């Protein structure tokens, strides 16, 4: 059951589909405890200088695990950053049984399999005036702030998006990293070529990272431009704890949109430089630190559903151990064995 839940959780989005997480499960006769670590070997340093996006990705996978376990009648009790001297250990999760699972909780777990990162143009989301209040209610306001960018402010976001790309234009490490993570020969991670927009398609999407062009298609030609709503997710400050909780809220938003039949695309390139991030911050009335943006809209009804992006095999992301001998802390042992006592 835990293995299936971890497999489902690992459908979480991550920057360039890098999947920068690692799980260690301690299995005993009475209970199982799961530890979440950030895997620094799977970060994208030329894109994500601070490591913020890797932590956000881990927050999303943590919330996905909570949702998957809830659907299996187990409540996840999460302790975040349980070991201050182990900065790469992000959370410890223990489980307690629950008697009743609602249809909504099961649907949320099912939405994990349905969610895609869709980089093509969207039509306007239907009944947004009804959906937006429900979406806001799903967000813990003490953890993150949700702003919806008005149509007349969108041009400022376009400026921020273009500025981000201009600042990276002559960065060979950034472009080499993009080429590697979008290689058509990578099988278990990265961004598959058919999920990227072609030249013709990205001309109709005003907000998006400039990935390498891998195809010459012209999908959704009936949409002359992108009519999505754009959400900004911000946190009270800019700590690692903020980034982790932001990822959990990002998971909530993406799955709520998916359950409502909407398509989504997470945008982080506008946050990767301080100049473009300042523009985004200005659109949120300077309240908090912008962490991610999300395009939300409707894919045309007859449009092909994007194929699921690949994921690493379970034995690459999950290690199961029997409960260690009495008096020895398993997470300390794990850190010593893997050298994860280094500072962040």
From Swiss-Prot:
Bias category Basic and acidic residues: which stretches? 323-336
* Gene Ontology CC: peptidoglycan-based cell wall; plasma membrane
Start and end residues of each stretch annotated as Disordered: 304-344
Q: What induces it?
A: A member of the dormancy regulon. Induced in response to reduced oxygen tension (hypoxia), low levels of nitric oxide (NO) and carbon monoxide (CO). It is hoped that this regulon will give insight into the latent, or dormant phase of infection.
Spell out the SUPFAM superfamilies in the cross-references. FMN-dependent nitroreductase-like (SSF55469)
Highest taxon above the source species: Bacteria
A single GO molecular function term of this UniProt record: oxidoreductase activity
* Entry-linked InterPro entries: Nitroreductase-like, Nitroreductase/BluB
Record-annotated membrane-spanning stretches: none
List, alphabetically, the Gene3D superfamilies matched. NADH Oxidase
Question: What is the protein named?
Answer: Uncharacterized protein Rv3127
Q: Organism classification, top ranks?
A: Bacteria, Bacillati, Actinomycetota, Actinomycetes, Mycobacteriales
